A protein has these predicted regions:
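Charged, amphipathic alpha-helical linker segments immediately N-terminal to NTP-binding catalytic cores
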Residues: 1-27
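ATP-dependent carboxylate-amine ligase catalytic core
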Residues: 13-16, 27-29, 33-48, 74-160, ...
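Nucleotide phosphate-binding/pyrophosphate-handling subdomain across enzymes
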Residues: 51, 138, 143-146, 155-166, ...
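A conserved segment at the C-terminal end of the G1
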Residues: 55, 63-80
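Beta-strand->loop->alpha-helix junctions that form or flank phosphate-binding loops
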Residues: 82, 201-203, 215-234, 255-258, ...
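Acidic, Mg2+-coordinating active-site environments of NTP-dependent enzymes
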Residues: 120, 142-147, 162-250, 265-287
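C-terminal helical cap/extension that packs against the catalytic core
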Residues: 200, 204-209, 213-222, 233, ...
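Short, flexible loop segments at boundaries between secondary-structure elements
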Residues: 366-370, 431-437
Length: 437
């Protein structure tokens, strides 16, 4: 509802707001903090309305945020979460108390931004970031979790000073924006660090420039492998966390599937411990949160026999992680891959760790301008396992299902759009709710 005397909002439904935002700014991606920071100040959104943990990294961002969200909710805190991109609905990007924000509050937030921006142009992502911060302030969140959209140093979420900054991993992706190697990319991701404010790096091989940037700011940096780590898994699935001068023994298996998730959980625990002076936690909340975390599209099982898994892996590092999951969990039958990918990705680098693990490939088209045509993707698979091309990702998945036998598994991957296409198609799992934490 508009404030008394306020001008009528530009639009009264979410779809119109989002369509307009996609066309409004001169560039779809426009990294930089000046414009969005000025509007944030005009709206009174700085400093932050609650303690902030900002999470960046090439892979593992969403999972680490999901663990943190579940831990803080288990402790009884009011948690505001901002992530991107979304899978099915824009509303997924902003969560209040574990639930996607409704259309009405989003429209109110966009109207407030539009009134305040004083002719300053904003990108689609900048509108979303400001909407999240406005809603977190209005709803009086106890803790705010922000996922970096792209890079870190010039990403819109970096208009707020993080009380704890997290870089989960550093791999090669988005080179045209962030640089061609891990050193350049690591520096961009370290841009969320603040002087004398704690930070966490979950990468076991942190780039030198990331370490140097932390040192130049006097940022206390907790490093995976030396300052904290996840212990091995016992036969009953439990594991130990070691770090920050303490040990948490017999932690439950993480609520997210895949061996990599213990490392993401350990990174989240470390970040939460570093914020304990402002947001105290109990060991019980940590245990419950680790077990209860959920996140759609991250090595998520949709059905059994044949097993259907979806994973948003879309860069070489993500593909290596996915390949590790598949190798760790061999099946009696075949592994069938349903894939579509964006044209600007390192396709050979994505395929390399998976070639030997896949017995048949099913490629489909995506109705996305950036998508690589399946015929072009097939060229990269010449000499590999058999390849089928279908008119859409959903039809590619249907073909894989029809040709799968008991004991086979199907893995759908390559981008958020690929996973979304399968989640919203009329398969048996289509009505299953999307879960975050």
């Amino acid at each position: 509802m508009s404030e008394p005397g306020a001008p009528r909002p530009r639009f009264d439904n979410l779809s119109d707001w989002l369509d307009w935002q996609e066309r409004f700014h001169i560039r779809p991606i426009d990294l930089g903090l000046e414009r969005v920071g000025r509007v944030a100040d005009l709206m009174g959104l700085r400093p932050a309305s609650a303690p902030v943990i900002t999470v960046g990294g090439t892979n593992g961002k969403g999972s680490t945020v999901a663990f943190l969200e579940a831990i803080y909710r288990a402790a009884g805190y009011r948690v505001g979460v901002y992530t991107s991109p979304h899978l099915l609905r824009y509303n997924e990007r902003i969560r209040l108390q574990g639930e996607p924000v409704g259309d009405g509050p989003l429209c109110e937030a966009f109207a407030a931004i539009d009134r305040a921006r004083d002719n300053i142009s904003l990108s689609y992502f900048e509108f979303g970031t400001l909407a999240a911060l406005w809603l977190f302030r209005r709803e009086s969140m106890d803790v705010i979790l922000l996922e970096v959209g792209l890079g870190g140093r010039l990403d819109a979420v970096n208009i707020l000073d993080a009380h704890v900054a997290v870089v989960t991993s550093v791999g090669i992706d988005h080179q045209s924006w962030l640089g061609e190697d891990r050193e350049a990319i690591g520096f961009e991701k370290a841009g969320i660090f603040r002087g004398e404010q704690p930070a966490v790096c979950g990468d076991m091989d942190p780039p030198r420039r990331l370490l140097e940037h932390a040192a130049s700011l006097d940022t206390p940096l907790a490093l995976a492998g030396s300052d904290f780590h996840a212990g091995p898994v016992a036969e009953n699935g439990v594991w130990d966390y070691h770090g920050m001068g303490m040990t948490l023994t017999a932690l439950p298996p993480p609520g997210l599937a895949g061996s990599v998730q213990r490392g993401n959980a350990a990174t989240a625990i470390t970040a939460a411990l570093l914020l304990e002076d402002q947001v105290p936690l109990t060991e019980r909340a940590v245990r419950e949160g680790i077990a209860q975390a959920r996140l759609a599209g991250r090595y998520q099982c949709l059905q059994q026999d044949p097993a259907v898994w979806v994973d948003v892996a879309h860069n070489p590092q993500g593909a290596r992680i996915l390949g590790g999951h598949l190798a760790d969990e061999p099946v009696k039958g075949r592994t069938l891959a349903v894939m579509a990918v964006m044209a600007d990705k390192d396709v050979p680098g994505i395929l390399e760790p998976l070639r030997s693990l896949v017995d048949a490939w099913y490629l489909g088209a995506l109705d996305v301008p950036r998508a690589l045509a399946p015929e072009e993707l097939a060229v990269h698979l010449e000499g590999a396992a058999p390849v089928q091309i279908q008119a859409s990702v959903a039809e590619a998945c249907e073909a894989a299902l029809l040709q799968a036998s008991p004991g086979d598994r199907i893995i759908v991957f390559g981008s958020f759009h690929t996973v979304a296409a399968v989640l919203q198609a009329p398969f048996p799992w289509a009505d299953a709710p999307l879960k975050s934490a």
